[in-house]
């Protein structure tokens, strides 16, 4: 009898994806984030399922139901905070994962990269709708401000916003549909993840050298399963430190005030992982221009493979491109900081400068540095 691991139709798929998968022997810890994202997704679905058992998506009771989860449900507080802070860990891993792809030229695997961009948009939509559900002040006003941006679309904008709201303002209908979408989207994300992996396993993984590694591969298990477990332990350590010692560190105090349409908070801002895009949006005085810049700040990733001018795949041996990538990281950190600051001098100016720097770095400076480095190779 043949090994069931290799002959059973279902187990064979798992075997070829996680056990006998030929993997480059030199991939570093930067390749851990894919598996960590899978764990984050599973954790979010699991904690979210238990939260959904006790949550009510009605404007009159939503805030109270979240309070009830934290106070009265067995271990409800830890489930709620694991879900809220799990989203932060999810986005930390997403940013690391995308940054790895940029640094090592993984974007040359175009199908995998493009599915990844669709995944990023879907994850961001899910997180945004999840932030609305507790129905605190920042939930309500965040939903109002962000959905209202669609009114900048010519001709259909206003109708589109009212269609999304299900009325003339963010109200009961909005909350109910956001809960429905927030529940279904993680399963759509899971399906997209399967497609992401399907495309990845068609070509095989990239590696730090950027060279073809067909001549030097090792089985995924036990080498990388052990390595992934180490990464997982560190992730759980960070998450539980956050959940058990300062669960509200990354949240907004305004969200502990029930939503009130008659009282606007002094500073409306989204969760920290959207602040870079929010800062770009705010730095453009024109509404439509701001919305376009907001979308393009993520969509620009789709153009990155087309702008690859270097003869080398990764940035491992390209110091000039490395400098530019770290400049981009610094710029994104600056934008994240600015997004959380009030709209006043000097923050407006800093935000505008950081936004101006963001797009040319990716669209102009990086391709030019690739050309210069090609010249240096023949110098």
Swiss-Prot record:
It is found in: Mitochondrion inner membrane. It holds the Pfam family Cytochrom_B_C. Keywords: Electron transport, Heme, Iron, Membrane, Metal-binding, Mitochondrion, Mitochondrion inner membrane, Respiratory chain, Transmembrane, Transmembrane helix, Transport, Ubiquinone. It is a multi-pass membrane protein. One of its GO terms (biological process) is mitochondrial electron transport, ubiquinol to cytochrome c. The chain crosses the membrane at residues 33-53, 77-98, 113-133, 178-198, 226-246, 288-308, 320-340, 347-367. One of its GO terms (molecular function) is metal ion binding. The keyword Electron transport applies. Belongs to the cytochrome b family. The cytochrome bc1 complex contains 11 subunits: 3 respiratory subunits (MT-CYB, CYC1 and UQCRFS1), 2 core proteins (UQCRC1 and UQCRC2) and 6 low-molecular weight proteins (UQCRH/QCR6, UQCRB/QCR7, UQCRQ/QCR8, UQCR10/QCR9, UQCR11/QCR10 and a cleavage product of UQCRFS1). This cytochrome bc1 complex then forms a dimer. PANTHER family: CYTOCHROME B. Heme 1 (or BL or b562) is low-potential and absorbs at about 562 nm, and heme 2 (or BH or b566) is high-potential and absorbs at about 566 nm. This is Cytochrome b. It comes from Cryptoprocta ferox (Fossa).
